[in-house]
UniProtKB/Swiss-Prot annotation:
Function: Antimicrobial peptide with activity against Gram-negative bacteria, but not against Gram-positive bacteria. Active against E.coli (MIC=5 uM), and P.aeruginosa (MIC=40 uM). Acts by disrupting cell membranes. Is able to depolarize membranes of Gram-positive and Gram-negative bacteria. Also acts as a potent chemoattractant for human leukocytes and activates them mainly through a GPCR, possibly FPRL1 coupled to the ERK1/2 MAPK pathway. Is unstructured in water but become helical upon binding to anionic lipids.
Name of the protein: Dermaseptin-DA4
Coiled-coil region: none
UniProt keyword list: Amphibian defense peptide, Antibiotic, Antimicrobial, Chemotaxis, Immunity, Innate immunity, Membrane, Secreted, Target cell membrane, Target membrane
Family the UniProt entry places it in: Belongs to the frog skin active peptide (FSAP) family. Dermaseptin subfamily.
GO process terms (BP): chemotaxis; defense response to bacterium; innate immune response
Tissues and organs where the protein is expressed, per its UniProt entry: Expressed by the skin glands.
Main location: secreted
Pfam families with a match to the protein in the record: DD_K
Annotated localization: Secreted; Target cell membrane
Entry GO terms, CC: extracellular region; membrane; other organism cell membrane
Length: 32
């Protein structure tokens, strides 16, 4: 139902944030 959709969206957002954080860390370490 609606709740599982909201939960899935939250999971996807968390995963995207994690991936973005990893990419940012990689870019910073490469720049250094």
């Amino acid at each position: 139902g609606m709740w599982s959709k909201i939960k899935n969206a939250g999971k996807a957002a968390k995963a995207a944030a994690k991936a973005a954080g990893k990419a940012a860390l990689g870019a910073v370490s490469e720049a250094m």
